[in-house]
């Protein structure tokens, strides 16, 4: 047998290379591994779709981990508890507010990540998206590079991931939508054709609009969670996550329907 040092390194390089090669062409390429996109990845992978999620940071989970101001608890309303049940996440009803529940944000983040991966989605962490593939009438994939390359400003050409559908799950900045508007001159399905911008906090409105604004904004290009709210000028809602989870489930259904046309 080869030296164990060589066995370890060879196995890692071989396994990762196979994983990446198998996901250079996918059904759905997602950008950002926050709660909404992870829910979408979970349901789409369960439905048999080939899903790759690209996350800039080392740790997926988005803004879930820290709860509210580092108090690692979050709130979810009753409309979203079925999603928690699907993922095996525990929750406790708030005695003074029936229909609202607290849950451990670390458990939720961990369960979302595990659920998506266990269902068959692949998460590529420490990988940034610097551009989209655009062929005039449809968004057709992503242009990716290592996050350290991006942050160090190294002159290294990227690689591409071809996809039938692209999901912007980048949260408040709507990074992929911004690329689409500013670089590809795409006109989004918004009142102005551009990104309207997120408004201040209004919990009730923000929760409702997060779900309402989740949709296909251009052929092949979808947005969920706070990215969708930013596109349509919705309000933010803080550490209540029902809307985010339901947005992820909604966009999974929309993408699945689009793929099966």
Identify the function of each model-found stretch.
Residues 21-52, 244, 251-252, 256:
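N-terminal Rossmann-like FAD-binding beta1-loop-alpha1 element of flavoenzymes
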Residues 66-90:
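N-terminal glycine-rich dinucleotide-binding loop that anchors FAD/FMN and/or NAD(P) in oxidoreductases
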């Amino acid at each position: 047998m080869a030296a164990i040092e060589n066995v370890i390194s060879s196995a890692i390089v071989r396994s990762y290379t196979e994983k990446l090669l198998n996901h250079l062409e996918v059904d759905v390429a997602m950008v950002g591994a926050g709660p909404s996109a992870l829910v979408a990845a979970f349901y789409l992978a369960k439905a048999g779709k080939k899903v790759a999620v690209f996350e800039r940071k080392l740790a997926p989970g988005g803004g879930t981990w820290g709860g509210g101001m580092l108090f690692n608890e979050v709130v979810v309303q009753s409309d979203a508890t079925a999603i928690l049940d699907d993922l095996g996440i525990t929750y406790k009803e708030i005695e003074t507010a029936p229909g609202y529940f607290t849950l451990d944000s670390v458990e939720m983040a961990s369960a979302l990540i595990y659920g998506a991966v266990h269902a068959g989605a692949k998460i590529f962490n420490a990988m940034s998206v610097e551009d989209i593939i655009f062929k005039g009438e449809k968004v057709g994939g992503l242009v990716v590079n290592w996050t350290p390359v991006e942050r160090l400003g190294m002159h290294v050409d990227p690689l591409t991931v071809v996809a039938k559908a692209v999901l912007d799950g980048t949260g408040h900045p709507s990074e992929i939508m911004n690329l689409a508007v500013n670089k590809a001159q795409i006109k989004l399905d918004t009142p102005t054709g551009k990104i309207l911008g997120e408004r201040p906090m209004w919990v009730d409105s923000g929760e409702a609009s997060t779900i309402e604004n989740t949709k296909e904004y251009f052929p092949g290009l979808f947005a969920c969670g706070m990215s969708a709210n930013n596109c349509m000028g919705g309000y933010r809602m803080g550490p209540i996550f029902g809307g985010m989870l339901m947005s992820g489930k909604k966009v999974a259904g929309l993408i699945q329907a689009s793929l099966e046309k």
